[in-house]
Swiss-Prot record:
One GO term describing the cellular component: plasma membrane
One Pfam family here: NADHdh
Reaction catalysis annotation: a quinone + NADH + 5 H(+)(in) = a quinol + NAD(+) + 4 H(+)(out)
Cytoplasm found in the keyword field: no
Xref: PROSITE patterns: COMPLEX1_ND1_1, COMPLEX1_ND1_2
Oligomeric form and interacting partners: NDH-1 is composed of 14 different subunits. Subunits NuoA, H, J, K, L, M, N constitute the membrane sector of the complex.
Organism, scientific name: Orientia tsutsugamushi (strain Boryong)
Annotated protein name in UniProt: NADH-quinone oxidoreductase subunit H
Keyword Transmembrane helix carried by entry: yes
E.C. number: 7.1.1.-
Function: NDH-1 shuttles electrons from NADH, via FMN and iron-sulfur (Fe-S) centers, to quinones in the respiratory chain. The immediate electron acceptor for the enzyme in this species is believed to be ubiquinone. Couples the redox reaction to proton translocation (for every two electrons transferred, four hydrogen ions are translocated across the cytoplasmic membrane), and thus conserves the redox energy in a proton gradient. This subunit may bind ubiquinone.
Family affiliation: Belongs to the complex I subunit 1 family.
Name of the top EC class for this enzyme: translocase
Single GO BP term: aerobic respiration
Length: 356
């Protein structure tokens, strides 16, 4: 009914509606293909980088320099037999990886790669949409642990739920601090605000940027916080019973979330598609190039940490999230807000709301 009302109100005819639907469909398909390729080659980059750090060669047989290795891995997983445990809940067992995979892609619909390159611009709730979508991804893991009817999988799912409680508050509040400084919830406006407030969003937000980065390490179950899938304790955790494309969906979902978390960090703390320090001399380079370079830099830190640090104990993660990060973020929000008020540097949008 709403669609019909919009068509009548805006004077759209059937041809225009079909054309617009076709354009949106092409954009969605192009975005999904680019994300799948980026995710596949992130796994290749990870294996190469870690191999270099460990004085190994890494994948080098499939194609020149091993560049076809992700495609070979994808073909292998497609042709593997999907095995479902006899006592598993069949429907939930199949649905769980689909939930995780779809939600990992859904957040990309509002990410601005450049000022004019964004699938769907949400002016008010872009940040809330991403936080909601990424937080729902844990339900896929919990369902997988329950449906597998395995003790290892169930323990991995319980760990994932408790882990989310530990880091989610600190991560969300670090984003709230950025919203206070910019006075915006539109992702593009947050990037544009960093043209006029580079000191506030780089130097003042640096501690929160570090906390946010560590939180997305936990969010994506990466070392040193890969407790839900700890090989030495839980074999493979929540996905221990999965094979074939179901396992591939969990695998792709994890790496797609890595790219999504790195992209959001780039937008919040690193200037998004703007050149470094907003230097005029570098504006001739397209914004999406800067965006990709910054995201790649954050992703390299993911890989570097995996090759360097051991796994945290479970109690250490809980302590870090709730007793270290949460008080620091709350204190930093109070400090930044106080400085903004007493230095008359409140953003116009926030000042208007407070004056009312």
């Amino acid at each position: 009914m709403t669609i019909c009302t919009d068509i009548i109100a805006n004077g759209y005819d059937l041809k225009t509606l079909i054309y617009n639907s076709g354009v949106v469909s092409i954009k969605v398909i192009a975005l999904i293909i680019c994300l799948l390729l980026a995710t596949a080659y992130l796994t290749f980059a990870e294996r190469k980088v870690i191999a270099y750090m460990q004085l190994r060669v890494g994948p080098s047989l499939a194609g020149p320099f091993g560049l076809l290795q992700p495609i070979a891995d994808a073909i292998k997983l497609v042709f593997k037999e999907p095995i479902i445990p006899a006592k598993a809940d069949r429907k939930l067992f199949i649905i769980a990886p689909i939930i995780t995979f779809v939600l990992s892609l859904l957040g990309w619909s509002v990410i601005p790669i450049d000022h004019d390159i964004v699938l769907s611009r949400i002016h008010i709730g872009g940040i809330l949409f991403i936080l909601a979508v990424t937080s729902l991804g844990v339900y896929g893991i919990i369902i997988a642990g329950w449906a597998s009817n395995s003790k290892y999988a169930f323990l991995g799912a319980v760990r994932s739920a408790a882990q989310m409680i530990s880091y989610e508050l600190a991560m969300a509040l670090s984003i709230v601090a950025v919203l206070i400084v910019t006075g915006e919830m539109d992702l593009i406006q947050i990037v544009e605000a960093q043209k006029t407030r580079p000191i506030w969003l780089t130097i003042m937000m640096l501690p929160l940027a570090v906390i946010y980065f560590i939180s997305i390490l936990a969010k994506t179950n990466r070392l040193p916080f890969d407790l839900p899938e700890a090989e030495s304790e839980l074999v493979a955790g929540y996905n221990v019973e999965y094979s074939s494309m179901a396992f591939a969906m969990f695998f792709l979902g994890e790496y797609a979330n890595m790219i999504l978390g790195s992209s959001l960090m780039t937008i919040m703390f690193l200037g998004g598609y703007l050149p470094p320090f907003n230097l005029e001399i570098l504006t001739f380079i397209p914004g999406y190039i800067w965006f990709i370079l910054k995201v790649s830099m954050v992703l390299f830190c993911f890989l570097w940490i995996r090759a360097t640090l051991p796994r945290y104990r479970y109690d250490q993660l809980m302590y870090l999230g709730l007793k270290v990060f949460l008080p620091i973020v709350l204190a930093w929000i109070i400090v930044v807000s106080t400085i903004l008020v007493y230095s008359n540097n409140l953003p116009i949008a926030l000042e208007t709301v407070l004056n009312k």
